[in-house]
Amino acid sequence: MEVGSAVKNFDVGDQVFFYRKFSDIGTWAEEITINALDVAKIPANTSTEEAGGVALPLLTSYDALQQLNAKVGEKVLIHGAAGGVGFQATQLAIKMGLEVIATAGERDFEVLQKAGVKSITNYKTQDFAQEIPQQGIDYVFDTVGGEVLK
């Protein structure tokens, strides 16, 4: 194993996870060459199981949001915004400059507000199908599925 000469933030032996589209060649190989921008260190004292538990929802959200080709200021409804995938999508969407409109249970409002969400609908007590269209949305990121968005 080796690290490219221009790469300054990784050393041989670092525990890492990486992003690579499933369609890319090499994700099942024992060794591959990958761009350092697609790699993140696994924090010390973090098991590979724990790292995978963070990486999978994060990368699922990242890949889905990238496919939108959304523009700064556009609005995305993230249904189930406080769940594993939903919270990662919420944070990434905000970093991308999107306005997040979230649905969540009331117990999750505070954590979503601290993350920067300004519009939250309680899907347990409010008819979000009536509330949200008034705000106008450009995209829907559904982490709940089933009958909920019909």
Range-by-range predicted roles:
Residues M1-S23:
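Glycine-rich beta-strand-centered segment in the early N-terminal region that forms part
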Residues G4, T125, V144-G145:
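Short glycine-/small-residue-rich Rossmann-like dinucleotide-binding loops
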Residues Q15-G80:
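NAD(P)H dinucleotide-binding glycine-rich loop of Rossmann-like/cofactor-binding domains
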Residues F17, T121, D138-F141:
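N-terminal Rossmann-like NAD(P) cofactor-binding module of classical short-chain dehydrogenase/reductase
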Residues N35, A115-G116, Q135:
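Short, structured coil segments at secondary-structure junctions
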Residues V54-T125, E131:
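Mid-domain Rossmann-like dinucleotide-binding core that forms the NAD(H)/NADP(H) cofactor-binding site
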Residues E110, T143-K150:
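Glycine-rich phosphate-binding loop and adjacent beta-alpha segment
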Residues E131-D138:
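A short acidic, Gly/Pro-enriched loop at the edge of an enzyme's catalytic core
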